[in-house]
Amino acid sequence: MGNIILLTGFQPFLDYSINPTEAIVKELNGRKIGEYEVRGVILPVSFRESGDLLLHHFQTVQPTAVFMLGLAAGRGKITPERVAININSGPEDRDGIAPVDEPIRQGGPAAYFSTLPVRRLIQRLNEEGFPAEMSNSAGTYVCNHVMYRMLDYLHEKGSEQVAAGFVHLPASKELAAQHHSLPSMDLKDLTRAVTLMIEEL
């Protein structure tokens, strides 16, 4: 069996009726990209369920890389995340839970760095004409939650050879049509950008 990459996206959330990461993951699921076979998973925007579901799929699939996607409505560039922090805080999730400054894991490390080759991903995207830059904050919402949970799990299991990290994407044009002030990119371009990043791993 070749290398498997676990590619995750999210369902729509808050007042965003479309989440482009959901469409991208569905489009790329089952594809062969570079040396990887893509296994796609759509996660709920839920502090309570998203991390457990992610780890369940990781244990089932046993991938050699984990590439997590999320929507950063308002950002105009593709932004690979450098770090995840041990905090849950934000507006109500799908379950009506709105934590305030709660640790993701009591006693866990304050932060974990992405183990993806973040700068190389950005360079590849820029070379291909995509606006991209590093982000030093994945926020404190569910995107940060799943990034932290994944990296914490790999650290605790001594499986840090598995490349894992998170990339935030701008809104798609379909979503921006509903929220006119949002910077956006075409969904096909976002899908192409994700494909390029996976090729670069």
Swiss-Prot record:
Catalysed reactions, semicolon-separated: Release of an N-terminal pyroglutamyl group from a polypeptide, the second amino acid generally not being Pro
Primary subcellular site in the record, as a coarse category: cytoplasm
Record keywords, A-Z: Cytoplasm, Hydrolase, Protease, Thiol protease
Location relative to the cell: Cytoplasm
InterPro entries, sorted: Peptidase_C15, Peptidase_C15-like, Peptidase_C15-like_sf, PGP-I_bact-type, PGPEP1_Cys_AS, PGPEP1_Glu_AS
CDD domains from the UniProt entry: Peptidase_C15
EC number: 3.4.19.3
Any Pfam family matching the protein: Peptidase_C15
Molecular function in Gene Ontology: pyroglutamyl-peptidase activity
Key word Cytoplasm present: yes
GO biological process: proteolysis
GO cellular component terms, A-Z: cytosol
Active site positions: 81, 143, 168
Similarity-based family: Belongs to the peptidase C15 family.
Function: Removes 5-oxoproline from various penultimate amino acid residues except L-proline.
HAMAP family (UniProt xref): Pyrrolid_peptidase (MF_00417)
Complex and partners: Homotetramer.
Protein name: Pyrrolidone-carboxylate peptidase
Lineage per the UniProt record: Bacteria, Bacillati, Bacillota, Bacilli, Bacillales
